[in-house]
Amino acid sequence: MKQNDPVAAYFDKLPETHKRQFEERASGANFNFQKRLTLACELGGTSSGRLLDCAAGTGEITCALLKSGRFNHATVVDVSPAMLQSARSLLTSQIKNVELEFIESDVFTFKPTDSRFDIILCLGLIAHTGRLDILLPHLKSILTPGGRIILQTTLTDHLGTRTVRALTARSEIARRGYRISWFSQRDISDACDRAGLRILETRRHNVGIPFGDRFSPWANFQLEARLEKWASRHGADAIYLLGAG
């Protein structure tokens, strides 16, 4: 672990909590983590070859993509040793016909030892790192010609996101030890333009009721399920498929 890295220290406490988000439970968080997995698989459906997950967490999304049988290599990166170990346990038990490489690293300093990647997953990362103008050119530099990046963010264009940001900014710094980064659709679009990347497709999800799970996980789950179509157009979260411009 990078010494004194507050992001690594924060996520080292969360592997079990993170894994539970992908289980079949009636909460808004579970609904949206599973939706993120589904949409990532959908956007990555035409990719094959070499995969990089640059913030793998506990590995569920990586695992789902690798089970397609289209990939022969996966490099799994995470700054948190505990998260990376959880991902290693899952992937080595579930994936048998793919060359797997596990690297504890900050994605900003990660450099592949040999080949570039056909698809790069960047999910649940940029809120904790910011620095899009450094990250996106770096990811583009390790992408094959015709390769794709899947990038996820929560958007400040959404009223619920702005409400959460306004009410939690100070407490989040105290709780995590670092400041959360927030992005609008324009922020993402402009950063892609500067990096020479194009937004090829976008998927939206997450009704985004502020603190919905705190009041009633079951009711929040019902809202997410019933308003899924609305969220596909106006949701708080966006997942982008990027390619070189």
Language-model features, listed with the residues they occupy:
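Conserved class I S-adenosyl-L-methionine
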Residues: 1-45, 48-57, 150-172, 213-215, 222-224
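Class I SAM-dependent methyltransferase SAM/SAH-binding core
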Residues: 58-109
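A conserved beta-strand element that flanks and buttresses the S-adenosyl-L-methionine
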Residues: 121
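A short glycine-rich, Lys/Arg-flanked "PGG" loop and its adjoining helix->strand segment in the class I
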Residues: 133-145
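A C-terminal cap/extension of S-adenosyl-L-methionine-dependent methyltransferases
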Residues: 164-170, 201-245
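Acceptor-substrate binding/catalytic loop of class I
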Residues: 170-187
